[in-house]
């Protein structure tokens, strides 16, 4: 199966054909919500703390047959992927990983789609923000919650990610407790 279109863009349409509900956009957020995110991100960055922002996704797919959530971790740092996979597995999640364009396409074509995607912003062969936009436009994957992971956090980058449909933003390096809280928030786990 050809995973890329002639233009080299990622093409997931051949793997999925059922429509999904579109994710709410940043533009649909109230001005108060936007100001809260902006102010919070700015203050955290000024104080030197790392930033973690997460909002509950409007709709999360049903649990797998074994009652666990599945998470797809996408990052070009294979060592970080190993650590994430081990830690998240110990926390009870089913974890899949992808580290380059080919493995990303292969994982996104699998059924069922993941309940959550952890997505690195800065990868060498594809921008995490570009991939996020493609995911949000995809009929089958558009409603899958996405938490962005990045080492380059500015208020503008956070706003750009949230405006393009990210459900959360976690800066690297991160503490697993902060990432775990963001995951639980987005998935609605109490």
Where does each model-flagged region fall?
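Charged docking surfaces used in two-component/phosphorelay signaling
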Residues: 82-90
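Alpha4 helix (beta4-alpha4-beta5 surface) of REC/receiver domains from two-component response regulators
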Residues: 130, 153-168, 181
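Active-site residues of response regulator receiver
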Residues: 120, 150
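The feature encodes the CheY-like receiver
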Residues: 81, 124, 142, 154
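C-terminal output helix
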Residues: 174-184
